[in-house]
Amino acid sequence: MAYRNVKYGKKVERRNYSKIIYDVDLPNLIEIQNKSFNWFLKDGIEELLQDFCPIESYNGDLKIYFGECYSTGPKYSVEESKTKDASYVIQLFVKATLENTLTGETKKSSVLLTELPLITDTGTFIINGKERVAVSQIVRSSSVYYSSTFDVKLNKNLYSGQVIPARGAWIEYEEGSKEILYVKLDRSKKIPLSNFIYALGFNNREIIEKVFGKSPLLNSSFVKEEDMDTGNALIELYSKIRQGEKVPVDTARDFIRKRLFDQKKYDLTTVGRYKFNKKLDVLARAEKTYLVHDFVNLETKEIILPKHTFLTKDKIEILRKNRHFLLQELFDAQHNLENETDEEILTYKKDPQSRELYIKTNILNFRTGEIIFPKDTLVTDEVIKRLRKSIQLLDGKVIEFFLRSKDVYQKDLERTGVFNEILEVYLSKDEHDNLQHKVQIVGNNQKETKKHITLSDIIASISYYLNLYEGIGNVDDIDHLGNRRLRLIGELLKNQFRIGLTRAEKHIKDMISVSKFSEVGPGELVNFGFLNGVIKTFFANSRLSQFMDQINPLAELTQKRRVSALGVGGINRDRAGVEVRDVHNSHYGRLCPIETPEGPSIGLIASLAIYAKVDDYGFIQTPFFKVFVQNGASYVSNQIEYLTADQEKEEIIASSGYELNSDATFQKDKVIARKNGEIGIYPKEQVTYADISPKQIVSIATASIPFLEHNDSSRALMGSNMQRQAVPLLVTESPIVGTGIEYRAAKDSGSLIIASQPGIVTYVDAKKIVTSDQEGNKKEYQLTTFEKSNQDTLILQKPIVSLGDNIQKGDILVDGPSTNQGELALGRNILVAFMTWEGYNYEDAIIISEELVKNDVYTSVHINKYSVQTRELKKGSGKEEITREVPNVGADAIKNLDERGIIIPGSEVKEGDILVGKITPQGNVDPTPQEKLIQIVIGEKAREYKDSSLRVPYGEGGIVQSVQYFSRKNGDILPPGVNENIRVFIAKKRKISEGDKMAGRHGNKGVISRILPKEDLPFMEDGTTIDVMLNPLGVPSRMNIGQILEIHLGMSAKNLNIKVATPVFDGVNDQDLKEISQEANLELDGKKVLYDGRTGEPYENRISVGVMYMIKLSHMVDDKLHARNVGPYTLVTQQPMRGKIREGGQRYGEMENWAVHAHGAAYTLQEFLTIKSDDIIGRNQTYSAIVQGKQLPKPNIPESFRVLIKELQALGLYVELIKTDTKENEVNKSLIDYKKEGYN
């Protein structure tokens, strides 16, 4: 038989039906976030601080430098932070140096940077005692993008381009009318492309044509050519950006230079530079073209490739190795727009190879005209020091160049020319020697590492745009994962730090500009309060910082692997189209095509696929087996390589259904494989990679659905989403029919305790486990017992190891909520029959056995927290007190309170019971002596205090599980004005009942409609009664046939007393199912004769019966069932409040109105719309009439109509409301007026 027995952990063995040869272990499922946070802590912060370094005063006298960062450990442990409602944070410090540039003196000290929340081992943050998760954001990568649209009128493709940085100005190219190409800089008005090229420094048309070639479209873009040069072009570009403002050439040049090439304003980031170099590489465009000229080694004059060579991949590699011969200098350092203008450059080199710099012009005392340093003076440290001492006498340009920001030598090194790689090609063989048809391909300088855009990049991006019209280059698919990347927690925090530091920089600059070096140090000048505020706001309010979904381990794990396109810098949910939401072929093995929300966020929130990793640039990778050819045979090796979507493009990858021989060679000569996202059939010799596993396409939640391949995609989506809503049960049970990932999902979720070192268990109880290694080193593990989760469910860890057990590093030591023997256990294995029963399971309703209720099969425990605080009241009013002496209540109400007035743990409480007795002073708390005497004699404390006790809210109750008491007297840290804080935790057992929602793993959800006694239930020939009856009509239309296969396999496995693993796309097939059914002595159709429990007669037809794994969802009737007799009304509309928590009414909507109309219940309808809703006068009159036994009055004007009138009056409209009998205008009549007229 096609299976093997596999052990999962030390406790569970499953019969695994997987067919693949190599069973690759899953990577750590939550390491992505921790790795990113650790990078930020180690390198990211210091990198960022260097971008802001130094901060100098406005006159340049003082500078602050930031050095090494270090941190101090968290004040509280993870558990203490949760208990005390504190944040789990570290304090970050930075070593700061204050320098006096005039004297060279320095002062050093450490400065508090911020309090930074620290990530826990399980990938969460604790903010104010609550666990939160930072969700990764998927965004468009900074790069150069080109797109095309087909113009029906012109019958041709129109191209557009965008140069997009992480921060800074965008450059956009587009084609306008009359075939003129235009450019927009930073979303400004457009200018002709030719003018933009002039502005870059090209002074005449001949030079432009020499670089870009004789492109017809570029020629048509030359407008107003006769008076156009670099200066005029710069002025025009400045005018477009600044909305018509006119300035001199130098000002315009400096403005454009700072807008595009200033590192503080323009940032590509490392990934942006990588993408720019990859996109603008001249060799990436040159493939499948012909060389115009011989490609020559300029040093030896040897011909590397002769002219007319057809550039194949091999020839491109030869060019790549000799690419330095493609470089041409387009501008020297003096004419490079990136560099500062001539007037600002006060140095030059006598020898270009030397490091020596000389002053270019005389440096004068601008007050007297006296020469301080003549030209040709060698620039030394002594010269710089003398200049600093004479700073009051120097011209602003001299100060700017010699004494501000960067070192003068560094400035000179940065003054470089513009180099581009240029290649001339023909598109076809027929065009050889026809110079009119040659195409110029200009690429950027591939050695460039700058984090901002360069002139070389801009020139290359223009060339790429022109090449598109000539048939060279490719347009980009923005939804391809090669162009989208993840911002992990490290990068998200770095962006927040940048915002905070930008705000702090201005404040620090203002401070040091008004301070004297002798009077202050770095500690007094540097204040990073802005940074602290930004970090707190991010963790508390950002869409990417989410309250942790702790209801079960799968929900926890899925949230940590979630990917969101929403949030700051992401996509707006309201404007997102179909394309960005849709499944893309590049998602294969990277993002799950199934798991996504069903509402307005569909497609914008996704989950990482099961094997997916993230590279250093943030691109999602997926693993493949490398395929080798040896002795003429292609074989799949066990060598694993992780590829991004871009790297995968040109590879031919065998899809996961390939069949292998025992020596790992392909069985068939042709293999189904993918190339560029398209599926085709390829000879096995051409295949370069093979899928690592059939399940690599889906996420963890989706991979836990057995027989996924037999379900409709929308039902699979519901199945994966509903598993995350499973409530932890009192008694857990792992599925008989699993998929093999239950163990790993539970282990990596963070809800279990994993052994951190090998050893032998020396002590075990319900609260701790102690292990000892060979050297005698002890390790203690504290268990979590009876704690409340974020979703108010019970967290209880139970040991699964015994005294003397030998454990290894990585072993699971305990079971937590929804786990069993270290495996994920969200529900229970129950006996299911697909049959109808008196119509009670119509429309997905579910009938269950009373035995499930009696035996606590689906019983769950829920814990609610209630808290109360005592405060100092305003001056002279006293303070609130916790006491047992609550006024105006009987002895029965306080019988379960201790001497302090706090409920005793273990007490059973119901709605309205006092949990904490509290009194609040009211009125005058300083009575006269006579009043004091009366109070002492009579004991009337009730008159001066009111009862403000904490009571069990409406609809709640249970057993008091624990009480926490915090007091300022005991040294606990409490908010200002709070003296005491008491928390009461109430646990409640919820048995399954009518109205609760249940589901299988195949999207087969339903609500319990009837709980039948055991004696009424259908039973099998051996007397076994059915646990659950499901409607068979729920299967064909939903097309989730997986549930039928599951019950057949489950029944066989239960009879054989085994557990089964059937991995998705690679599990039990038709033949396997037949064989295991025969092994279990079951009928091949999986049907049985059932007998009616009421009559004992057999049903007419045989019925499908089997074992299905069903879960109880968090949508429980106890949370939703609600009725209202009387209750509060909203103040404005006077209609009943909404919601159970406010004791609100049920919504009476349009459809309910139609139903009452149809029944002809006129008076009921009138009452619904008037006296039972918002007719204030009418409801008072009705109350009086009922009490006095009179006839009910006619309704009056509803309050909502009065609200409408007030809104019309607020618009300035004159409204009259004339009463027919009195002819009075009642529009402004108040309720008081009505009372005076006799309405009660």
From Swiss-Prot:
GO terms for cellular component: DNA-directed RNA polymerase complex. One of its GO terms (biological process) is DNA-templated transcription. DNA-dependent RNA polymerase catalyzes the transcription of DNA into RNA using the four ribonucleoside triphosphates as substrates. Pfam families: RNA_pol_Rpb2_1, RNA_pol_Rpb2_2, RNA_pol_Rpb2_3, RNA_pol_Rpb2_45, RNA_pol_Rpb2_6, RNA_pol_Rpb2_7. This is DNA-directed RNA polymerase subunit beta. InterPro entries: DNA-dir_RNA_pol_bsu_external_1, DNA-dir_RNA_pol_su2, DNA-dir_RNAP_su2_dom, DNA-dir_RNAP_su2_hyb_sf, RNA_pol_bsu_bac, RNA_pol_bsu_CS, RNA_pol_bsu_protrusion, RNA_pol_Rpb2_2. It comes from Phytoplasma australiense. Belongs to the RNA polymerase beta chain family. HAMAP family: RNApol_bact_RpoB (MF_01321). PANTHER family: DNA-DIRECTED RNA POLYMERASE I SUBUNIT 2.
